[in-house]
């Protein structure tokens, strides 16, 4: 079947998560590939409108036509094929989950002139779960161990793990395999085996067979049992997906509405706030941006967020309207009165959470309000006093510009941003008659971005 035209743009799609056992890698890839880490990253073009395939395009038809590796008839492939075919519902579910990622991954593989069979490895590795982690701490859809990730430029910090970032990890995985393929003289089966078990093991197996006068092709090498199954799994999947109708496997209909579009962030922003503006759940947003480990986007990781295409315009409009503007650390002007302010306790508040939110100490809160303990009641008023702690509030505050929208009130704006109405009035000269489009300056802490 001839594939219909597909525009393989740099657009990611993400489906639902799955759990399952993931294989343990013994990758021992060296740092030699670091120099190529950015070679293709800079070439990754994004379609900011979320466009990924031409009308009537069929992703699986395209991939099926590109699966061109020869598949020998042997017991190892036959065994893996039978295992997959005994659970056809799994094949449907995992390809549905894989579809979102496939647009970008297949595009990168095609651009690099690599075998399309490689896009099937994340099915073998992790069932396309970006949150998957093995016992050896291999992570992401490509199951990359920490040391290999570092060798290939994958940033791993407390707040961001590029091994779970689909773009970064795919770039690294393909860089690895390109390097390995050169090492093994263009033999892709040996390349895939080395990706799984490490180049050292494959080279040692080749050396052993040469010394014994045996063949050095993949099927003849004395490799670990996992690796002996790893390559056949990839080839079994290739045969099944290429001939899905013959095998009675129902592949999901591709749906471009699941495509993720990149939305730029000019500064760090709370994930809960982005989810609210985009109209999606926080859990889905975390899956779409699995590399981010904390609750803040655009801090340690990429300066953009991936959201479904159908939500991208809504998010861009919200960002542009000033619901959240670029945040820059700003000291409150010297002539701004900071003698005191009043905070109304909300349900769920604790003394420590209020202190953290406002940049003051719990001791100061107790002193200013003559509190003997830490017990609070919703609706209770707390005075935030002057002095050093008040100045710390100013020093730890951020200035944002909020553009008033239809239906807004001074009260709703203040509540949304966790500030006091009196402060909003103090920071802005004319708040008596708010109109849509009016701009307000607010001083808030980064961790006090609106969450509703």
Curated annotation (Swiss-Prot):
LysM domain location: 341-384, 400-448
Q: Where is this region: Slt-type domain?
A: 113-198
- EC no.? 4.2.2.n1
Identify the GO cellular component terms for this protein. Answer: membrane; plasma membrane
- Which catalytic reaction applies to this protein? Exolytic cleavage of the (1->4)-beta-glycosidic linkage between N-acetylmuramic acid (MurNAc) and N-acetylglucosamine (GlcNAc) residues in peptidoglycan, from either the reducing or the non-reducing ends of the peptidoglycan chains, with concomitant formation of a 1,6-anhydrobond in the MurNAc residue
Q: Where is the lipid attached (N-palmitoyl cysteine)?
A: 16
Indicate whether Signal appears among the record's keywords.
Answer: yes
Secretion signal span? 1-15
| Membrane among keywords | yes
- Residue positions of the active site: 125
Kindly list the GO molecular function terms attached to this UniProt entry: lytic endotransglycosylase activity; peptidoglycan lytic transglycosylase activity
- Membrane topology reported for the UniProt record: Lipid-anchor
Record's keyword terms, sorted: Cell membrane, Cell wall biogenesis/degradation, Lipoprotein, Lyase, Membrane, Palmitate, Repeat, Signal
Q: Where is the lipid attached (S-diacylglycerol cysteine)?
A: 16
What processes in GO biological process is this protein linked to? cell wall organization; peptidoglycan metabolic process
Compartments where found: Cell membrane
Q: Which SMART domains match?
A: LysM
InterPro entries the UniProt entry points to = LysM_dom (IPR018392), LysM_dom_sf (IPR036779), Lysozyme-like_dom_sf (IPR023346), Transglyc_AS (IPR000189), Transglycosylase_SLT_dom_1 (IPR008258)
**What's said on domains?**
LysM domains are thought to be involved in peptidoglycan binding.
Similarity annotation: Belongs to the transglycosylase Slt family.
**Its job:** Murein-degrading enzyme. May play a role in recycling of muropeptides during cell elongation and/or cell division.
Any idea what this protein is called? Membrane-bound lytic murein transglycosylase D
